[in-house]
Curated annotation (Swiss-Prot):
Record keywords, A-Z: Methylation, Ribonucleoprotein, Ribosomal protein, RNA-binding, rRNA-binding
Function: One of the primary rRNA binding proteins, it binds directly near the 3'-end of the 23S rRNA, where it nucleates assembly of the 50S subunit.
Species of origin: Shewanella baltica (strain OS155 / ATCC BAA-1091)
NCBIfam families in the cross-refs: L3_bact
Protein name per UniProt: Large ribosomal subunit protein uL3
């Protein structure tokens, strides 16, 4: 099953098992996901569900967005997300339908995608876990520098993709095979074991694990 949901990271806490074992969990609020468009092979060339969730101020909605939401008869949400469907998935789901966290009731593990926390401009040691150079023994300037980044006159350049200093974080990250600890349908909460990408209140895409 590839149908997933959009949630919001509430934060982390812990729960205790009957044996008294402490389990760190991330609490994800999964409010109703409203279907705004159903894409088909005939009209779009592929099958997918487009959903929205949450709310958005009227003065923050562009005219194209307003027209799109009005056409689907769905309240404007804080964004639009699309999930591809394979043959046999999503049959019977129509525009205006609402998907809730109960679809994970029988799911053991999930993959969670979000935007990682931005760290700004960082050096090679922090960004790529490079080893530091000697703190003494004659080294007084290059303790945390990258070291050699190329060869000589041949090739006479630095290869593309070379791990160097630069902007760290603020990129799309997926954490796979997180165990579903609890599904709270009444409060629209999903508890998964461990940490998920991103900061508090960040949007998350939750899907059944592909490697489970």
């Amino acid at each position: 099953m590839a149908i997933g949901l959009i949630g919001r990271k509430v934060g982390m806490t812990r729960i205790f098992t009957e044996d008294g074992v402490s389990i760190p969990v991330t609490v994800i609020e999964v409010a109703g996901n409203r279907v705004t468009q159903v894409k088909t092979l005939e009209t779009d060339g592929y099958r997918a569900l487009q959903v929205t969730t949450g709310t958005k101020k009227a003065n923050r909605i562009t005219k194209p967005e307003a027209g799109h939401f009005a056409k689907s008869g769905v309240e404007a949400g804080r964004g639009l997300w699309e999930m591809r469907l394979v043959d046999g998935e999503g049959e019977g789901i129509e525009v205006g339908a609402e998907l809730n966290v109960d679809i994970f009731a029988d799911v053991a593990k999930v993959d969670v995608t979000g935007q990682s926390k931005g760290k700004g401009f960082q050096g090679g040691v922090k960004r790529w876990n490079f080893r530091t150079q000697d703190m003494t023994h004659g080294n007084s300037l290059s303790h945390r520098s990258n070291g050699s980044i190329g060869q000589n006159q041949t090739p006479g350049r630095v290869f593309k993709g070379k791990k160097m200093s630069g902007h760290m974080g603020a990129e799309r990250v997926t954490t796979q095979n997180l165990v579903v600890v609890r599904v709270d349908v009444e409060r629209n909460l999903l508890l998964v074991r461990g940490a998920v990408p991103g900061a508090t209140n960040g949007d998350l895409i939750i899907k059944p694990a592909v490697k489970a």
